[in-house]
Regions:
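Intrinsically disordered, low-complexity regions enriched in serine, threonine, proline
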Residues: 17, 27, 57, 76-77
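Short, charged, intrinsically disordered terminal tails
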Residues: 77-86
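Short terminal alpha-helical segments
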Residues: 1-32
Length: 86
């Protein structure tokens, strides 16, 4: 698994959330990133909550998940559900 790709995914999610004025979620994800590393689950949940899921987000996480041999299966399923609900 490419740690930089995962980190970039979460950093980009933080930017997207800030654009949607989800500042509390963005700050939480930033704190988690600094303290514990990238919180993909939190990023996905926040993207879904704020209606920010796009095909591009799903494709990015699918590529990351493929590299990590299914490590993010649950997060990917949640993101896909968020896309279908959008």
């Amino acid at each position: 698994m490419d740690h930089d790709t995962v980190t970039t995914f979460v950093e980009d999610a933080i930017e997207e959330l800030e654009q949607r004025n989800a500042l509390e979620e963005a700050e939480y994800l930033r704190m988690m990133l600094e303290c514990d590393g990238p919180d993909v689950d939190g990023a996905v949940s926040s993207l879904v909550k704020y209606g920010a899921v796009t095909v591009a987000w799903v494709e990015r996480l699918a590529a990351i998940n493929e590299e990590s041999v299914g490590f993010f299966d649950e997060e990917l399923a949640e993101l896909r559900e968020g896309l279908s609900g959008a």
